[in-house]
Structures are given as structure tokens and as C-alpha cells.
Amino acid sequence: MAQGQNRTVLQSGQMHNSVVASASSVSSQPNMVNGISQDTLLLRQEMLNRTYAWLQQRQPSKTDDASKAKLSEVAKRLESAMWRTATSKEDYLDFRSFDVRVESTLKQLLSQRRANPSSSVSTMVQTPGVSHGWGQSYTATPMVDTSKFNSSNNLSDATTETGRLLPTNRMYRGTINNGRQELSAVGQMIPTPGFDNSANADVYQSHRNEEYSGDGGKLLATGSDFGNPSQLQKQRPTGSNDLMGYNLDHQLGGGFRSNIHQNTSGMTSIPLNAGVGMSGNNVHLANVPRSSEGVLSSTHFSTFSQPSQQPVEQLQVSHVNRYSMSNSGTFVSGNLYGVQTSSGSIETAVDMNSMSLNSMRRVDTSFGSQSGLQNNPLLKPHLRHQFENGNFQSSSNSKENLAQVSHRPLERQFNQQAHYGQYHQQELLMNNDAYRQSQPASNLVSQVKNEPRVEYYNEAFQMQAINKVEPSKPQNQYKQNTVKDEYVGAQSAPVSSSQLKMSPSFPPQTHQTQQVSQWKDSSSLSAGVQPVSGLGQWHSSSQNLTPISKNSNEEREHFGVRFHKQHEGTNNSSSVRESTNCLTVAPSGTLDVPHLPVGINVLSKQLNGDCGLSYKNQRRWLLFLLHVRKCNAAEDNCESKYCFTAKTLLKHINCCKAPACAYQYCHQTRQLIHHYKHCGDEACPVCVFVKNFKEKQKEKFTFLQRAEPSSASLNHGPKESFESMRTSSERDSEAPFVVDDLQPSPKRQKVEKPSQFAYPDTQGNPATISAGVSQAHFSMGLQEKDRLPSDVCKPVRSNVPMNADSSDSSRRLVPVSRELEKPVCKDTHMGRHGVKSALDGESLRLSKQEKPKRMNEISAPKEENAEQSLGVVSASNCGKSKIKGVSLIELFTPEQVEEHIRGLRQWVGQSKTKAEKNKAMGLSMSENSCQLCAVERLAFEPTPIYCTPCGARVKRNAMHYTVVAGESRHYVCIPCYNEARANTVSVDGTPVPKSRFEKKKNDEEVEESWVQCDKCQAWQHQICALFNGRRNHGQAEYTCPNCYIQEVEQGERKPVSQNVILGAKSLPASTLSNHLEQRLFKKLKQERQERARLQGKSYEEVPGADSLVIRVVASVDKILEVKPRFLDIFREDNYSSEFPYKSKAILLFQKIEGVEVCLFGMYVQEFGTDSASPNQRRVYLSYLDSVKYFRPDVRTVSGEALRTFVYHEILIGYLDYCKKRGFSSCYIWACPPLKGEDYILYCHPEIQKTPKTDKLREWYLAMLKKASKEKVVVECTNFYDHFFVQSGECRAKVTAARLPYFDGDYWPGAAEDLIDQMSQEEDGKKSNRKLMPKKVISKRALKAVGQLDLSVNASKDLLLMHKLGEIILPMKEDFIMVHLQHCCKHCCTLMVSGNRWVCNQCKNFQICDKCHEVEENRVEKEKHPVNQKEKHVLYPVAIDNIPTEIKDNDDILESEFFDTRQAFLSLCQGNHYQYDTLRRAKHSSMMILYHLHNPTVPAFAMACAICQQELETAQGWRCEVCPDYDVCNACYSKGINHPHSIISRPSATDSVVQNTQTNQIQNAQLREVLLHVMTCCTAQCQYPRCRVIKGLIRHGLVCKTRGCIACKKMWSLFRLHSRNCRDPQCKVPKCRELRAHFSRKQQQADSRRRAAVMEMVRQRAADTTASTPE
């Protein structure tokens, strides 16, 4: 990362620091505040007393006056903070929530303190006589007690010591102009006499002792009051965990630590540009007992001013820390440790007697310039020679061994990294025993600990932890990783393996090496997964090492041998597998990454104890991959820059089954996953750690959830995410709702809900915490021996690959760090820039000596999400709760599961050839095959795409242009793109620059997604497993069908209840659905009985159709607008401009092999009595579709297929229902879908041929014939005969005003085109060839009636009817008119009231009352029958049982996905809900039912007010008063703090009507809020959700991401409004555009349909002409 970013962070931190200081001054003297009344002062005093008492309860041992004074100071700060954050006096004095508010305030102050530690500048004065380098900017770099550093470098519990200034003005982009001058800056400052703010140290230190007592006796940190060395012997009692999770020192102590003790550990003070190659002082100051973070404890000083009692030549002096050294107390004998490199470092010792204090000035810059130590006169000649040559050779005399640096000129900057990386590791070696001779390692990291906030520390370490040398050749040659000469962070000096002489003769080193691994890991995990492949390559002699406990000698010796073997394996590997030690990231993105040793069993050996240093990294790797599995953020949106790259790796693993895959990190990662899945060892240092890690997270998460409501009340913002409530005192943004993407990821995400906690954002505001785990919850001290550092990486499932393109986007998860987030690799074996990926499997190794028993004592994040995310093994191993309903298999009995598997391998729906091919593949099943269907690779059908401007379908493999505009992606065909002469192309009325378009080929292919069993690790297709990726919120354990059968048979589990996974029967029933079901079941029973009678069998012996469910899944009120040109012709005749109607969608489900499969669907339009003529009381059967999977596949008595019988009965039942409700007619257009397109159900099976028009028409007529027999249908005719001709005694006027006007029908669109052509012809314009046929309309037909003036509307009407008749006549039989009531033969109206006058002699003649009156007044000649002498007598027949008004008693069922057939089809296409095979039809139907049971707008689905997770139907609890307060079951069970009563949300099965009404109310409320927002000008409007909607709209105006969660919410709201809006001047953003967009899409679809029909007619005419003999 560029160093300029560090400077930016510094500035924000400095500014924030002043704010905190100001607040402190105010809070410390509350009575001095002007303008506060005496009563208020008394109230505040009362609150101060209560706060003091609260603190005293937690400090029972502090009874002396000094301690009380310190507690009083802390109480003042807390009271002042609560006063500032309270919104009202009542809120301030609410003692019911006092405890929670205090705790919340502590957390907030913690964020400020960590971001703004007390600066040492105020306690320093300039050293007289020393040049200060005026003009330079000095950076305060407080020293940090890193015992609280977790493994992500999070300063969770940091106490700080300040006392350094370093000039930063000469540091830019990783270079240092004057290192010596900058390093000497600290020496120019001395402490201010008499200023000591360490008075409060013991108050906070006691809290630290209390909280971290569970860490097994962690050494006390630096503090001015700890002068007695005996304190170091005291170990805290185990098991003590403060419920708060934070001690006072953790939260406020940073500003009260002593500033007197300077950097006694000899670490380099560096500026905020952490990682600059300033390692010149990386020579140890002294060997003294130290705290676990490398900070010298004050207990090591007898007196502050006691002079050094060690020979000067034994002191490892850094001139930067010369002042600190001179003040240090008694020092033990010191050793100078040399530098260690990243690729094969050697730890050696140097006789300190050979060096003098005077030489240290040269030592300061030697590592930066490679000249300092060479000029040291006291350095032994052979050691100096070794150092100059960079040869890391182990000397026989251990005191004379010095780790050496490669001296190649191009690698000189990497030498700086060597000090950093290895001394940083040595630092932890000294943390084992307070009385052990420590070997402190001075390194760059300890300088970074002096930064003002933990984020800076993260950046510094991440920079140099990622930037490293990459092995470029198998011969162990290393190339230099340079990026424009910008090196951020110290970089490792490369050392070839030939320079490393491994020997198992140094077992004492091993334990310390383990500690190095721990410290390296604990300080670098924020860099993600840092491979430590070279940690086993240490060279040392046991003479040099500090004594270690005897009981570990044997194991240490074993480790030494293992390191040697590991190193050999590494050096024998190929170039892509050579091992290096340190990971670095150069600013421009180049990356060199180590690789695991060659060998298939490497990982298993590591996990079984062959590589002790691997355990820590294995955990880190798993945790990082678990985050990657869950993260749904886009490539540039995730907090982790490497997240997207890791997704690429996991996506590769998705398909990879090669035993020795050459893809980088694939093979090793799979091995680790395999072990993790099968590990049952209770002492496994990798698996047990993760399990215990979860348990501790649960405890912390429980506490935080209880504190949540109070935190929210302190900040008075809308609903916020948990992390922002906990860490920021300036929170006012609404937490994003969790939005489900329509398309689940191809691989199951085995992670749980997104974290409600945060990692520190190293680049943001110090108080800002990104989605992840709070740094405050990763506080963990490094304990002695068995200490386990906290793995910061959220435990995320790593064993299952996932799609890199996860939409939905939409859910952020734990970022591993801010620096190891740079994408490193694409689908290649090398990185994106030709370098290796940072996700090296070598990083999967950990030290074995970390005992499982200590894992329970880790005070790491204890959030529930970590527990949920670790769904890696079965419940018996991982202890996590199972989420029911992730797979439909859970409903099945073992017999049903076996039936399902057998059905999968039958490939029902495919052609015979394809089915046989797949069956043959199943016989040769490989390890890469699905364990259920036995086939490996299955691809979905390509989704059809259409040109936005012209609506033409883009052919397969054809080139086209695409662009994202608005909320959707648009496609432009080549002709339309070329026709746009300008530099823009019009897309939905918006000009889009051609430069934004991307040229693509329509050849995209999407493979089916996979899922892995948590028990047997077998892989299956998600479709085969009936896996619902939408229900898997990353928290579900999945058991494959085979393991499920075993568990059921062994009694370990039972099939879940049907209420867990709601099916078709659980959908709300309606009057219509009940009518259809009852009638269908009755008819099926009769048919089955008749079949049994004819076959001579009993009823049970004859197969019958069962398990059928019919439901109305959409029923919404709509308005059909008449097209403008047509309306202009009949405006004078009071023709209605719009027709209200109700659109309904009806689906039929049948349970096949245990799954309810959608087999049939139809959309209808019902125009009731509220519609004007000619649409009044009419029904339009707009679309009908079915798939050929109905069971049983038998014939009825009449010889037709049983499925045809069922579908006919549904239609007849619907017509019967309409007739009883008062509808008079039904209109059917028998038009099959276009080739390659579908009406409702997406992608039909190959065994089902698309019917020709005549076949489809016959199918409808056969149904109507049955309906006529049952007297449901009165008469059938066709559209042309009924409206276009006057046959018989018909006296109705032939006019287009009589034609029923339906949405999507053929003639309205055709009429509009004809009228447009007529107008163009009249104006002399050229006809539009695309819209009209070539034939020119003639006026001859009008001459006979004398209508020659086309400007007259009547003439236009006649001409339009004439032309329409010509078009419709060839296919008039396809437009079927069904009369449900009798039709008057004179006026052609359908009679629904009064009497109908019937002629007994004529079979089908009746007239209405009105026409009968006219008939009686006619002359005898014109009476019925016309042109006959004998006149017939007409008899009246009363019309009854027809409602005068049509009312629909069914509830409105509104759904975004089922609003129209196009919306439903788009849902299926976008998510690949296909019906081409039965196996896919089952899965698609399962997903359709999921959407049906979750009908609310996705962006505004109910979310838990505490954890922000989306609540599914029938889940959670809600407040009876607050409309927006809903909580999930998990949060409710842990206790909530809400003033009102909470009730359970009703389930779909318990209260279908209530749920339906609730959904409609919610949608109506949202529409009302949006309309209110358009007129609201109040900033603090109290209208419900007003500010939320305003925030969404503001976000949409500035968002550059396009497609984020907030944008999806905004667009969903706009669509919800636009579907119901009819205001032509609506001011809601995008309303008119959306309506125009939908209308345009519908018109294009209708145009394609009409064009196909015309083509079919022409083809039919051509065939007829060709077949006619001459």
C-alpha cells in the first residue's frame, strides 16, 4: 500500500486525538462547564458517584487512596462521555440501562484511545545542543503493549507508552532519504522532568490482570508502579473472564500509561509509514525478561536511575534507544543476534564482548546500507567477513555466529526485511519464562507497535509481511521483487538453500522456534495467511540458547529433525513450490509467494505432527478461506483485497479432482480440508483450536447482543449493524439490509451469517470498524509455553469452493486484513502479474506444542457468527447447531431418498440418446463425478438475450455489445450498434457512449453448482442434492443423501417436519384454488373408477394421479392503458382510455419422488364489471404452459393422456368458476411459443415437442368440447366471425370499438402498427419496413361505402377493420371466442340479465330484451327468420343466477417475481430454474416454492433489529408497538432489551391470511413512504422510514459501485412503486423510466410473437400453394 495512505491515517488520528483530549479536559472538570444549572450539576454528580461505585465493584482490591483517585479520574471520563452521548436528560438518567451504557461507553472510548494514544510529545523536551532538523515533521510513535495483540495485529487490549518522534517528511513511497538523521531524532528528545502520567497505570493493570488471568499467567506489561521483580512470578488464576470482555486498561489505559520508560527493548522507532526499510537499529538492546509482546517490563529495573551494571561491550545498543538504555536497570548478559532471512534464516549469536557502545552508531545504519557492521572495529573478523558476504553459515562457536545478509547489490533492500522478519520472530522466543534468559529480538515490528493506533501496526506488518523475495528458479535462485523501487516495509534478504546448513543438533532452539511461529503468526495474521515455510530453517547451537523446560526437550529435538526434512523437501521442489519465509506486497501489486513442498502427503504429515511450525498457519489458512467462502462482496468491495483471488482458487477447487493438481495451492488446500473433515483427534492442534475458538466467541457474542439496544439508544440512528454500534460514537447510518441474490453461488457457502463484528480498518477512521470481528474482541495475551495466539481470521468454511461472482451480493463477511487483501491470482498458476499467489498452502502449518487445553482460555472474538461459520465438520465434531431445511432431502424417509437417487440416474426429460450417454457415464463413475447422478460436468442451457433497441434475439455464438446501465445489463446487436451514427447508442431512451460498450460473443456457458457433504466429504450437484442455497445463510450443515440414510437408520436423526420446509400445500389457498382442486379431484376419482371398471380391476389396483396441489400464486389489480394512436380514433366515441383488470397466476404441483414439482401454469386476465365496454365481464387466457412429467403416464378411458385430462379439467374448472362469478366470455389465442422460447416454465424437456398451431388449437377445442357437454360453455366461435363479419341476422356494427382489448393480445399491437402506417401514408412518409408488410394499403375497399376521406375517424375505423380482417382471416381459427353466457344474435352482446328470447324452431337463436323490442316494431319482412314467409315465435327465458356485480373475495397476492409471466420467466432464467429434466424440475420447483413463501420485496424483507439477518417467513419475533422491530429466534433466546412486549411472528401454516395481509400492508406502507419522501423537506422527519428512504435515494445518486445492497434496495422500492403507479407526471425517481422500460420490453415481446405468427401464416400459405395441383 502506498505510504501516502499511512500519512493520511496519521492525520486523521492526530485530529481525533485532539478531540479526545478536549473531551477529557471537559469531563475531568464537570462543574466548570458554563451554562449548566445547579440541578444539572447535581444530577451529573449523582451519575458520577454511581459510575465510581460501578468501577469500585470491579476493583475490590483497590482500597488505597491512590487507587481511589485513579478510579475517580476514570469515572469522570465515563460520566462525561455518557453525558455527551445522551439525547435527553431522561436517557442520561435511565438507570435501568446504566450498566449497559457504561459498558458501551467503555467500548467507544476504547476505539478513541486506540486511535489516539497519549502522545509522548507533551512529556518530551528537546535535548540541548542537538540538531533537531527543523523543517522536518515528527511523528509520535507511542510504544504499544502488544500482549494484547491478536494474531491479526489488532490492538485489542493495548496499553501504550509514548516517547518517540521520528521525522517523516523525507519518506515517500517506500524510500528514505536520510535514515541516520531520522533515526537519531528520538535521541534529541528527553522526558519532561516532573511529568508523569503513570499514576493511573495500576488501576488499569489490575483489570488487565483480571481479564487475562485466563491466559495462564501472562507477564505484566510495562507500568511505572511495577518495580518489584517478584511480580513477574505471579501468575493469574485461570478461568477468570470478566464478562465485559474489556478491562479498564484495555479501554482507557492508553492515555494513562507512564511515559518515563522509553523504548527499552531497542526497537527501531519508525514513522507511520510502517515498513520503511529502516532496520539499522535491529540489534538487541539487552537480554532481559520481557513481556510477551517484546516490551521490557518495568519489573526488570531495580531503580529507574540505577546505572547499568553490565560491561558496556555486552550491551546491544541502538543509538536510537541510547537514552532508554542508560536508564535501564540491571541487565542480564546480552547476545547480539544476527539477521534472519525469509528463505532460510539462521539464528546465531555474536559475542557481545566484541562490540562496544561506540560502534553502535555504525550498527544503526548497517542494515540499510550494508556498511555499518563492516566498519565495526570490534566485530570479530570472521564474523564481519561473513556478514559482508552475506553467507549464513553456522559457526562452531555459537557466540560467534551472526545471521548474515545476502550481499547482492540488487537485494540490498531485502536485507532490511531480514531483520524485521527474524527479529520479530525472536521477539516471541523470550516470552516463555519470566526468569529465563530472554533473547529479545529488535525488529521493525516493535517499532510499529509505537504507532498511534493498531491499524498502523497492521499496515506496517502487512506491508513487509507480504513484500518478499520470490524464488524464480528451481535451482534456488531468487529474483528480486521490485516495484518502481517502492518498497513498503522491510524486505527479506534472499538466501539460497545452499547457504543453509541444517542440523538436528540444536533441539533447545525448537521450542523457541515454535514461539517464533506463534509471534510471527500473531503479528501477521492481519496480512491474511502468511506462509512460514522457512521457519524450519534455523541454524543455531544449543550453547547459545536460553534454558527451556525439560519436559519439552524430546519434542524440540523431534522438531529440529522435522525442520531439516521440511527444508530439504522445499529445496528439492520445483520453481513454483520453492519455499520462502516472508510474504510481501509491493504497492503496485506484484507479489511473490512461497509454495508448499512437493509431495502429496506433505500436508497430512504436517497435520500429524511432522512439521511443528505448520499448525498455526493451517488454522489461519482455514479461517481465511472460510471468510472467502462467505464473502459475497464484489471484487473491489471486500475489505480483504485477496478475497476475490481466493474465490478464484476455490472456484478452481470446485471442479478440480486431479490427484496432483499443478494449480497453485489447489492440492495442498484440498489435503488440509480433507484432514479437517475427517479429523477426530481430540488433541489435534488445528481442529480443536477452531472448535474451542467458536465456544469462546459465543460467550462474547452473548454479552454484546445484550449490550446492543443500549448502544443503539446512545446513538439515536436508524437500525445499525452491530459492529458500528459497538465501536463508533458517531454512527447515524442505517445498517444495510441483507439482500438475497437471486442466483445462489455455484458452490455452497459453508459459512454462517455475516459477522456482526468488525476488524479494524487500517485506512479508515480509528473508530470505524469494518464488517468482521472487533479488535476489542481479539484481545489475547501470549502465554507461556502452551499459549495460543488468537486467529483473527473469522472461522470461515474453507473446504468448499464457491463462485467468485456471488451476488447477492450482498453480504460482507470478515475481512482477513487490510493488507493481505490484494488480489493475487486469476485462473492461472501464477499470480495476476506473473508472480505467485499469497494463498500458499505452506502457510497452513502450525506449531504442535500449542495444547488443546489452552484453547478454551483464548479471549478471542466470541461472536456467534464465528461458531456458525465453522460448519466444517459434522455436528458431533464441531458442536455447532444444525440449521434445518437446507436440503429437501431432510423431509424424506430412507425409501424416498433411494427413490430420488434412482430417479436422478434415469435422466427423465432428455432425449433417448442423451439419457443413454449419461447412464453410460454413470457406469464408469470417477472421483470427479457427482455421488448422486454419477455424472461429472453438467451445464445449463444458455440464457436467451435480446437486443434492447430492436428486441431481436441475439443468436447463439453471435457477436454483440453489452453495457450496464441503470440496474440491469443491456445488449445491443451488431446492426443496431452500427446504425447508431453518433458516438452514442440509445438504451431505453438514454444515450450511452459507445466507449462504454463491451463487445462479446454469445457463447457463455454456466455449469451446475456443487455442494459437499459435511460428513463423508462427497461432492454432489446442488440440484441432485435438492440443496437450497437461499436457505443456507452460511450457517447450515449439509448431510448428503447417503449419510442421511445412515443417520436415519441408526436412529441418529429423524426426517424433519413438513413445516420446516414449506411446500405447495402451505401456500395460501383461495376460493379459486379450492374450486379447481375439488373439481379436479372429483373428476380424477370418476375417471379412475371408470378405468378400473373397464380393466376389471379394483380401484386401488389402477394407477391414479395423486398428491396434486393447485394454488393461485399471484392475484394483483392492474390497469391496461389503451395505445395512443388507437385511442385517438375513438376518443370522440367516449372510448375508455384504460381498463382495470385482475391478473392471476395459477400453478399445479404434483409430488414426484418426494418433491412437489410445478407441472402446469397459466396467467389469466379478468375484466370485471368495473371495466368499460368492450372488456366488461370478459376473461383472457393470456398464457398457458406445462411440462411433461405428470405421473402416472397412462391413458384415460377416452384414450387421451391422463396429464391432458388433468390440464383440461383445470381449464374447464376455471371457466366454470368464471361463469358462476358472472363473466360472460373467454378469449383464447392458440399460439405456440417461438422456437427456443418459453411462456412460463423455462426450458422444456426434449421429450416434449413444441406443438404446431393446429395441434394446439385442437387441444383447446377438445377441452371446450368437454366443457360444452358439461354446459359450462354455451357456444364457441372465433374472433373473426364474431366481430369482423355480419352473418345471418346480425345487425351489429363492424367497428374496432367492439373488439375486446387485452394486454398482450395480437390485434392491439397489430392495430397500432397499422394506424401508424396509415398516418405515414397519409403524410407521404415512407413506410416503416420493420413494422409493416410491404403491401401498400389501397382505398378501393372504401369506395363502395363512400368513405374516401382518411382524415375522418370513421373512415380510419373502417380501413383499420378491413386491414385487420385481412391479417386475421388466414388464422382466424386460432383466435377462439368462448361464450359462457348466451349471445344476442342481433347485437352480439352477451346477456347477463333480464330475459333472453329463444326460438324453439331454430336451434341457436336468441336475442336480448332490447333487441326483442326492436324486433317487435320491425316490418314483417325483416322479422325472424328473415327472408322467410313463416315467422317464428320467440319465447322468453329468464336469466338468473348471474351476479350483477363481479366481486373477488380472494385476497390480493402480490409478488415481484410472479407479477407477470415475463417476470417469472426472468426469475427462472436468471437463476437457471430449468425444466428440461426431471431432476432440474424438482430443484427448480423447490426454489420457486421458496420464493413463493418469501413474497416480500427482497430488499425490504424483515431483518433482525439486533444481528441484521433476514427473517424468513414464520421465523422470529416482533414488537406489537414498533413497526420496524423484529428479532430472530437466536437473538431472542439470548435476551433482548426492548420496552414493549414481543410476540412471535405467525407462521404461514398457522395464519396464511394474516401473513398475506401483512405483506400487502408492508408494500402499501413502503409506497406511501416513498410518496411522502418526494414532498418531505424536513431533515429530522419523524415519518416512519422517511430518513431511511432518503438515505437510500441519496446513496443511489452518488454510488459508484452500482449493484450494492443499498442500490438494490432502492431499485426494488422504485419497482414496487412503478408497478402500481399510473400518474403520467409522477415525480418519484425512475418511475416513468421503469414503466417505459417494462412497456418497451412487453411491446418487443409482443412484436416478436406477432412477427413469428405472420411468418407462420406465410409459410402455411406457401405450403398450401405448393401442395395444390396445377
Swiss-Prot record:
Pfam families: HAT_KAT11, PHD, zf-TAZ, ZZ. A zinc finger (PHD-type) spans 970-1046. GO terms for molecular function: histone acetyltransferase activity; zinc ion binding. Residues 493-527, 538-551 have a biased composition (Polar residues). A zinc finger (TAZ-type) spans 611-690, 1554-1634. Zn(2+) 4 binds at residues 1519, 1522, 1538, 1540. Keywords: Activator, Acyltransferase, Chromatin regulator, Metal-binding, Nucleus, Repeat, Transcription, Transcription regulation, Transferase, Zinc, Zinc-finger. Zn(2+) 1 binds at residues 1384, 1387, 1408, 1411. The keyword Nucleotide-binding does not apply. Residues 1061-1497 form the CBP/p300-type HAT domain. Residues 717-734, 842-863 have a biased composition (Basic and acidic residues). Residues 490-554, 709-765, 830-863 are annotated as: Disordered. It is an enzyme of class 2 (transferase). The keyword RNA-binding does not apply. Acetyl-CoA binds at residues 1184-1186, 1203-1204, 1259. PANTHER family: CBP/P300-RELATED (PTHR13808), HISTONE ACETYLTRANSFERASE HAC5 (PTHR13808:SF30). Acetyltransferase enzyme. Acetylates histones, giving a specific tag for transcriptional activation. This is Histone acetyltransferase HAC5. It comes from Arabidopsis thaliana (Mouse-ear cress). The gene is HAC5.
